[in-house]
Amino acid sequence: LCFINNQLKQQISAVMQRSTLKVITYNIHKGFDSSNRQFILHGIKDSIRQIDADVVFLQEIHGERNISNNRFDDWPSNNQFEFLADEVWHHHAYGKNAIYKSGHHGNAILSKYPFVEWENIDVSLMQSHSRSLLHGTIEITETRQHVHIICVHLGLFGMERQRQLAKLASRIDSHVPHDAPLIVAGDFNDWLGRAERYFAKDLNVHEVFKLSHGRHARTFPAWRPLLSMDRIYSRGLELVDCQCLHGNPWRKLSDHIPLMAEFAIK
């Protein structure tokens, strides 16, 4: 009887643990510190593992880089998103948006849940400033629920961002059912806070930190965050918790600090 009770306790505990969906978004600066001198991808790997997120949204991640293979002894033998995913996140998608002679970088999503489908959407306005949206749908294994996830890295220039935001809003409107759970996360470069006009009123998509704290989280630069560059938006999910991961080790890794949010999925 004690054995059965312990089994039941374990099952209940497992169900309770699966009742939330934890996500983080992180611009990893191609695996280098803010000075571009130290290769810190191994530190990033160890740190994001400690968060134990179900889904990881990554920006500025190398899909291929040939020159660096010869410069750093600890450069991974596989690509960066596979190196970070390792044995924790068995499902991943990568969309390249900046291509050069020595390789390419872009956005990636690491997930503990399988992808139903994913697509990389080019939103570049100029060849020299390539940008894309990585849109995937994952299935929560225990409930068969589908969740749309979009990883974003928008441009540095105001007019460029406005057009990209319009394309993102159009993508949500045309490809995400209104009753489907949705998470949009990434580096919006939106320090002026103009993304809201594209999401809140017409799409009912809200930024979790502004919703819970009254303002966007400050994520850049990592050593003294002043600008609100990174965001997590959601629709159709109940927010349980959200945190801006200040302090060590994050301030010594990338030039951005990550954001974490947890949602109820029941």
Label each region the model flagged.
Residues 30-33, 63-66, 100-103, 157-160, ...:
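Active-site environment of divalent metal-dependent phosphoester hydrolases
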Residues 3, 8, 13, 137, ...:
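Metal-dependent phosphoester-hydrolase catalytic domains
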Residues 23-28, 47-72, 110, 136, ...:
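Active-site beta-strand/loop signature of hydrolases that rely on acidic residues for catalysis
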Residues 16-23, 105-107, 111-116, 129-151, ...:
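Beta-strand-turn-beta hairpins that frame and shape the catalytic cleft
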Residues 101-102, 126-130, 158-160, 250-253:
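Solvent-exposed loop/turn segments connecting transmembrane beta-strands
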Residues 95-100, 124-125, 245-249:
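Short, solvent-exposed loop/turn elements at beta->coil junctions and helix N-caps
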